[in-house]
Amino acid sequence: MSSFLNFNMNKEMKSYLLGFLFSSLLTTLPFLLAIEKFFCSEVNYIIFLLCAISQIIIHFVYFLHLSFDPEERWNLITLLFVIIIIFIVVFGSIWIMFNLNHNTM
């Protein structure tokens, strides 16, 4: 029983370390590109966006342990629901502020 727990712990620790290494690399890369100015600003924006999206995916996979297994379908449905609610709140607030600005002018 204890060897099973040690194997599972090592697998989990390896997952956390890989996630930490990937996320720290994807954090330092945009800082390096912004400081050193290797590319023009448009290319930097695209690289920043790709790093941010890939870092979100890495956090979901390595730290939240989301997968596409049939047993974990509810986790993905919950994540989709949270993303929809955040989208409604953020863009609804922007829409309301735009209309308030338009009505006061």
UniProtKB/Swiss-Prot annotation:
Main location group: membrane
Cytoplasmic side: 1-14, 67-75
InterPro entries: Cyt_c_oxidase_su4_prok (IPR005171), Cyt_o_ubiqinol_oxidase_su4 (IPR014210), Cytochrome_c_oxidase_bac_sub4 (IPR050968)
Keyword Transmembrane helix part of the UniProt annotation: yes
Subcellular location: Cell membrane
Segments traversing the membrane: 15-35, 46-66, 76-96
Keywords, sorted A to Z: Cell membrane, Electron transport, Membrane, Oxidoreductase, Transmembrane, Transmembrane helix, Transport
Record-level GO cellular component terms: cytochrome o ubiquinol oxidase complex; plasma membrane
A molecular-function term among this protein's GO annotations: cytochrome bo3 ubiquinol oxidase activity
Stretches assigned to the Extracellular side: 36-45, 97-105
One Gene Ontology term from the biological process aspect of the record: aerobic electron transport chain
Membrane topology qualifier: Multi-pass membrane protein
Keyword set includes Oxidoreductase: yes
Role: Cytochrome bo(3) ubiquinol terminal oxidase is the component of the aerobic respiratory chain of E.coli that predominates when cells are grown at high aeration. Has proton pump activity across the membrane in addition to electron transfer, pumping 2 protons/electron.
Entry similarity comment: Belongs to the cytochrome c oxidase bacterial subunit 4 family.
Subunit field text: Heterooctamer of two A chains, two B chains, two C chains and two D chains.
Protein name as catalogued: Cytochrome bo(3) ubiquinol oxidase subunit 4
Organism for this UniProt entry: Buchnera aphidicola subsp. Acyrthosiphon pisum (strain APS) (Acyrthosiphon pisum symbiotic bacterium)
